[in-house]
Design a protein with these regions (language model features):
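Residue-level hotspots at or immediately adjacent to binding/recognition sites across diverse folds
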Residues: 1-109
């Protein structure tokens, strides 16, 4: 799991048994896969188009879910644990770290 640069933009991928799968929502201009847990949930950030700000994503069971913190210009996930708790950061005039899990969000200011 990681990302590669093709000379223009970054693209997330998952490598499993010497087979590579691109991890990127349909239509996205770029993606960065940053973390994976034991259930193979992948987290990271992507840009819906070249002019858009970054949005956080989760990828599990072949389904992408996008996350944007309200009022943020940028959101990304950096890691995920086996319980599905995610760490990341978001920009709301300044950079704020956060911990998010099922039913909670803890902002670090």
């Amino acid at each position: 799991m990681g990302y590669y640069f093709n000379g223009t933009t970054e693209h997330g991928f998952l490598e499993y048994r010497n087979s590579y799968t691109k991890i990127e929502p349909a239509g996205a201009s770029s993606s960065l896969a940053r973390g994976i847990n034991n259930t193979r949930e992948i987290v990271g950030e992507y840009r819906p188009n070249v002019n858009a700000d970054g949005e956080g994503f989760t990828f599990l069971n072949a389904k992408f879910t996008s996350y944007v913190y309200p009022t943020a210009t940028y959101t990304e996930f950096n890691g995920v644990n086996s319980l599905g708790d995610r760490t990341g950061d978001t920009v709301t005039g300044r950079i704020n770290g956060f911990l998010a899990g099922p039913g909670f969000l803890l902002m670090c200011r």
